């Protein structure tokens, strides 16, 4: 049978004793009034429940008196004591610590007793007690020594603990000091408004808090408490504070937008308000006026854009828009200088105008491709002259290649051959394309392809011969000039 509460003992809540003790210490001050209001709010509901449920819970007793009994363990008997503590005996004259008794903690009456507060709570109380809500480190030391004489004779390591809490704890942050203030070295420290409620909860958990004004005092620091009235922003959320501004995580926005693009519209219609829609967060303008959602196009517009891009890539070279770059799907044809010149020349030539205006049939493409292949060995001008004969084209090609051998080799020798191949790949669809790969290999290529390859090989050999001749001429002239210089010197 467990211990029974003696009849002389009456259940007494710890909060009422705390408020009575602090009201005696701080009589007539704002601390006692604020604490009394806080206690009235906290303990009014439990008192009502005790009064209403007194008849129902007659067998249940309040256990707040158990920690006041010094001989509690001895009342269980020696066997229980041996099982609980076989080595250490309980001392009858051990004074209860102020953190575990109903007597209020008074630093003046018990100067040698360590206060039941963590260093973060001490720093919090010191900063909140200042009128500007900002203090340097030395003023925090002085406040702790003034209100808690225990630290006057304590080892000096407590100052290091204060500094470590200021620098490592996220609840405290540095504030730039004003020019008018003369605090010497160091910077000012204040409470981060995001973590102020956490410090208040930690201080409430301590049994005796001598400064309850921090629970009801509104913040007065304009720089440190600008967003206290706003919603709490927790660490790791999509919105985080940096230099007093709300920012949005771009990685999360991109991921949400991609997920939404893959979501069918039927599921999107069932999204409640506040959920990501159209790739952007639906935010309340009153809470976050500075944050704007990212403009993401709807799914239908995105699909139309994709179709437009594919159609632009599949456009044949006989229908380029005037002044627009040629979009090619072949990476080997990514040469801006050759494609731009050829597109401009085709847009101005009568043949290209007639072909682009007419219906783009396979025969038109084939005629245009054969004409372009006959003049494929043309120079750096790159224009297709469909009304000239092949002999005139070869003479012009020789003239231009002698003037600009590098451009002719780069433009007509490389780009034109790939263009001709692309024309045949796009314009002509041989019936053998639908056959399997093995049957394609057994069939013979058409004669037109052989002729085209022969012409291409001939033009390349012709250009290579011109190039070699030019190299020989330049080498001979260079040797002759060197010999003349040597003879003149001798």
UniProtKB/Swiss-Prot annotation:
Residues annotated to bind DNA: 113-204
Keywords from the named record: Cell cycle, DNA-binding, Nucleus, Phosphoprotein, Repressor, Transcription, Transcription regulation
BP GO annotations: craniofacial suture morphogenesis; mitotic G2 DNA damage checkpoint signaling; negative regulation of DNA-templated transcription; regulation of DNA-templated transcription
Protein name as catalogued: Forkhead box protein N3
Region called Disordered, residue ranges: 1-21, 86-108, 315-458
Record text on subunit structure and interactions: Interacts through its C-terminus with the C-terminus of SNW1/SKIP.
A molecular-function term among this protein's GO annotations: cis-regulatory region sequence-specific DNA binding
Chain segments annotated as transmembrane: none
Function in brief: Acts as a transcriptional repressor. May be involved in DNA damage-inducible cell cycle arrests (checkpoints).
Originating species: Homo sapiens (Human)
Major location category of this protein: nucleus
A single cellular component GO annotation: nucleus
Chain positions with Phosphoserine modification: 83, 85, 97, 448
UniProt biased composition (Low complexity): 338-361, 372-383
Residue ranges with Basic and acidic residues bias: 384-409
Biased composition (Basic residues): 417-429
Pfam families: Forkhead
Database matches in SUPFAM superfamilies: Winged helix' DNA-binding domain
Localization of this protein: Nucleus
């Amino acid at each position: 049978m467990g211990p029974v509460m003696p009849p002389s003992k009456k259940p007494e809540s710890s909060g009422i004793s705390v408020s009575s003790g602090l009201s005696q210490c701080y009589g007539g001050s704002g601390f006692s009034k604020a604490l009394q209001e806080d206690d009235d709010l906290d303990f009014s509901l439990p008192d009502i429940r005790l009064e209403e449920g007194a008849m129902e819970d007659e067998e249940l007793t309040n256990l707040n008196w158990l920690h006041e009994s010094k001989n509690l363990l001895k009342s269980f008997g020696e066997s229980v004591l041996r099982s609980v503590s076989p080595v250490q005996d309980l001392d009858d004259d051990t004074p209860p610590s102020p953190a575990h008794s109903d007597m209020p903690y008074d630093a003046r009456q018990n100067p040698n007793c360590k206060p039941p507060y963590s260093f973060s709570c001490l720093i919090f109380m010191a900063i909140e007690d200042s009128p500007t809500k900002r203090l340097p480190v030395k003023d925090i030391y002085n406040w702790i020594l003034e209100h808690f004489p225990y630290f006057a004779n304590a080892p000096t390591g407590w100052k290091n603990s204060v500094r470590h809490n200021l620098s490592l704890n996220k609840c405290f942050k540095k504030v730039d000091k004003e020019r008018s203030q003369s605090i010497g070295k160091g910077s000012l420290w204040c409470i981060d408004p995001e973590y102020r409620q956490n410090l208040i909860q930690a201080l409430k958990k301590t049994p005796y808090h001598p400064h309850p004004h921090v629970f009801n005092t509104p913040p007065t620091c304009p720089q440190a408490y600008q967003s206290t009235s706003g919603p709490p922003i927790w660490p790791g959320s999509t919105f985080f504070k940096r230099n007093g501004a709300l920012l949005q995580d771009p990685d999360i926005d991109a991921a949400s937008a991609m997920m939404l693009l893959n979501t069918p519209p039927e599921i999107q219609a069932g999204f409640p308000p506040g959920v990501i829609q159209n790739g952007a967060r639906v935010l309340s303008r009153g809470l976050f006026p500075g944050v704007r959602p990212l403009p993401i196009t709807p799914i239908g517009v995105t699909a139309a854009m994709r179709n437009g891009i594919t159609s632009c890539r599949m456009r044949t070279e006989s229908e380029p828009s005037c002044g627009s770059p040629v979009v090619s799907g072949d990476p080997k044809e990514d040469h801006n200088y050759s494609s731009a010149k050829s597109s401009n020349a085709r847009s101005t030539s009568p043949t290209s105008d007639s072909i682009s205006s007419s219906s783009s049939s396979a025969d038109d493409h084939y005629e245009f491709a054969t004409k372009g292949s006959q003049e494929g060995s043309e120079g750096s001008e790159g224009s297709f002259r469909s009304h000239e004969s092949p002999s005139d084209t070869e003479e012009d090609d020789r003239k231009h290649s002698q003037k600009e051998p590098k451009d002719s080799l780069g433009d007509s020798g490389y780009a034109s051959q790939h263009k001709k191949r692309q024309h045949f790949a796009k314009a002509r669809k041989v019936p053998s394309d639908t056959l399997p790969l093995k049957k394609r290999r057994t069939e013979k290529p058409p004669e037109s392809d052989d002729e085209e390859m022969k012409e291409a090989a001939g033009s390349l050999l012709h250009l290579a011969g011109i190039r070699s001749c030019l190299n020989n001429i330049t080498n001979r002239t260079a040797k002759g000039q060197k010999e003349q210089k040597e003879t003149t010197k001798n």
